[in-house]
């Protein structure tokens, strides 16, 4: 099963990932070493920026990144969850979901489906049918 690695400032992202049911959930600042593919869930800071802690983590481990999801607040308009756009563009990975604050049950369902899809797609690339 895939690792979900998250970054959370106010607790919204942590509450979201805890609702997903995934077994391997770790926080960015608790990771000493990463050697398996992962999905990143982060927040958006300031005016649509990627948090420095997330960026620092990705500088080391982006080669294992399968996809990204981000939290935000819709009052920020075009900057809502914009960190996902930046990470997706910078590291050429799909945006799995954008959710407001700590997300709804529908957000959790959509995110879980997208994680399963990207993991299946990634596994097929790593283990092609002979």
Swiss-Prot record:
| Molecular function per GO | FMN binding
- Which spans of this chain does the record mark as coiled coil? none
Please, one GO biological process term? protein modification process
Please, which domain of life does this record's source organism belong to? Bacteria
Query: What upregulates or represses it?
Result: Part of the probable nrdI(ymaA)-nrdE-nrdF-ymaB operon. Expression is constitutive but low, dramatically induced by thymidine starvation which requires recA.
Instruction: Write out the function statement from the record.
Output: Probably involved in ribonucleotide reductase function.
What family is it from? Belongs to the NrdI family.
**Could you tell me what this protein is called?**
Protein NrdI
Which species is listed as the source? Bacillus subtilis (strain 168)
List the gene name: nrdI
